[in-house]
Amino acid sequence: MPLTGGGHRAKLLPVLAMPSTQTAPAAPPPWLAAAASLGVGLALLACYWCTLAPSFTGRDGGELAAAVHVMGVAHPTGYPLYLVLGKLFDLLPLGEPARCLAFFSAVSAAGAGALLCWVAIALTGYPLAGVLAGLAAGLSSWVWGVANQAEVYALNLLLVVLALAAFVRWQAAPAPRRLYLLAAAAGLGLAHHRTSLFFTAPLLLWALWATRPRPLRLLAATTGWACLPLLLYLWLPVRSACHPPLNWGNTSGSWLWFWEHINGSLYLAFVLRTGAAAVISQVGAWGAALGRQLGLAGVLLIAIGLVGMLRSRHRPLGVLLLASTALYLLWAGSYRVADRQVFAIPVMIPLGLWCGLGLAHALAGLPRLKLSPALLRLVPLAGGLVALALPANLSLQHWARLDRSRDHRPLEQALLNLAGVPGDAVVLLEGDEPNAGAEYYYHALGRRPLPLLLPTEWAVYDWAYPLLPAWLRPALARAAPLPEREFMEWLPYYLREVLDPRRPLYTNLDAPRVPPGFVLLKDHALKRLVLPPGLPLAADRPRMRPVTELPQGSGWLLGVQVPPVLARGAPFPIRLAVRLQRPLPDGWDLQLLFLQGASPSPGGAVMVPRDQVFARRVPLLFGLALPATPPGRHYQQDLFGLPSRRLRPGAYQLYLQFCRGRHRTAPVPLAATVTLR
């Protein structure tokens, strides 16, 4: 395909946009591609090893290390493949369990870089292109940042590149066996991290669409190979049934709990929670940061590689990689969490690949510029310098910032919090990092004595009730109807009431409520609710009584309109019409309760039969704050609610209740029943 133009622009066009009729260079010997890939993997592993974290690094790292060490169940989606493979690395004599899992991450990320090097060589025929692709991706700050700590993202990266390598092999010589390998790689990715579908699903669907003919037997076999790795999720209920110390989701207790755990419904509330402008701004900030890391040369090589791929016989793969990149950026940019960039880490795979392809296109296009023979002999040397200079620049930029080899701060904080806590204590912790530190301190390191650990986030889930001691459940049941802010504030109060006064209660809550007679002491970095000597025991002290000062009866409620049949998780309207006989005192709220299998007692509490173990008790779904309405006036409010998907199908009775803080009036049953299905 001739390219027209004059001057320097005509000379540069062969480099920036290679013609689609260009023949691929001869493939290098297999041993050379293997040696280049092995060298890239070892170089990356050496960098990761020198900056490897000696302990857990906070947040999910401590929990994952504890779950692997005790063979428990991690937070949604469970990560069964990580738990199984991580246990093999946990047996290595490398020090703490978190360090062993950090080495697992390093091996996974280094393997991903080596595989990416092989893919680039297979696509271009240039070993230097593979070296640059693997090192540019592996030494980026995003990949390096998760390759030297105990996290799940490095293994996700390896599985994504494995699927890409399987697709390239199938593309070179389409055959059913290679298609099955691609399907199995896609299934392994889904058995670990659900976002791998953004990368593997387009590749697998394109391979199926491009296969001619497509007999039913081929489709069935491909589907079977893709679904076979998903059987790993059965590991979660099997281990949950063994009652490990760390049992997120209680997946053996109910198929509904198992399904909610593996599909990550808990985190769906964070997805697509930012506007289009915020997503564009976030993606732009990430692009600017990566551009500063790679420099002008790296950005130019990526552009050349992308344009060259779209103009070559590998155009379908280029389009698929562009689509995967867009999906990852949309997902990560719209995810409302602080460290959202970790979900966009697989984007470095196509960027690194395009960088390597850009070098290959530049090396192939330079001879077309009619350079002198002396300069042409320097082309391989120049390519080698670029392939090494860009990764060297990346390593110099990130080494000091990403070096975790001396980072003991999370473990030191856990030691400061928990050292000296007696074995009969109850430890109530709020926040991911404090809970991860406690789980790692006691379950991974095996520190004793072991107190009762109670993460506040567990207390709001129905699957957690069967895992808790029976004497603890009433306290959580009383706090469950409260809004989240008040729940955190009053939970220590209710726990303190059911505890033996001599049993210490530790918490890191900022402002917990202190029961009468107790004092709040600062013990290390935690607060301790204690009963000073000489005061009466809990059995001798008056219990908290519900306040019944507000009148109840037909004068309060005029009517309620609720659809008779609702679908779980689907929004629906509720209309309340209230007549106030006198102004509502400041601070009082009107709450609507959905209860199943429960009946109000004369004392005002909601009694739940023990055989239901609180699984059928439904927390407060709606809170309606009433203003100081003049007496005799009507107040009408339209509520737009969303019933929890965790509610079991069946009939629910509606109750009305006035509350202020811990004070409750007796629930008033409404003439309305809702059926969830």
Predicted regions and their residues:
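C-terminal luminal/periplasmic domains and tails of membrane-associated envelope-modifying transferases
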Residues: K11, L418-D424, L445-R677
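Transmembrane-helix signature of polytopic, membrane-embedded enzymes
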Residues: A34-L42, L116-L139, L158, R177, ...
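Transmembrane-helix motifs of polytopic, lipid-linked glycan transferases
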Residues: L38, L42, F103-T124, L159-A166, ...
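Membrane-interface transmembrane helices that cradle and orient dolichyl/undecaprenyl
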Residues: I121-P127, A147, A163-L179, G189, ...
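Perimembrane helix-loop-helix junctions
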Residues: R169-A172, F198-C227
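Hydrophobic/aromatic-rich transmembrane helices and adjacent perimembrane loops
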Residues: F198, V319-L322, L330-L366
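Hydrophobic, aromatic-rich transmembrane alpha-helices
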Residues: G291-R315
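Signature aromatic-anchored transmembrane alpha helix within multi-pass, membrane-resident enzymes
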Residues: L310-R315, L357-L396
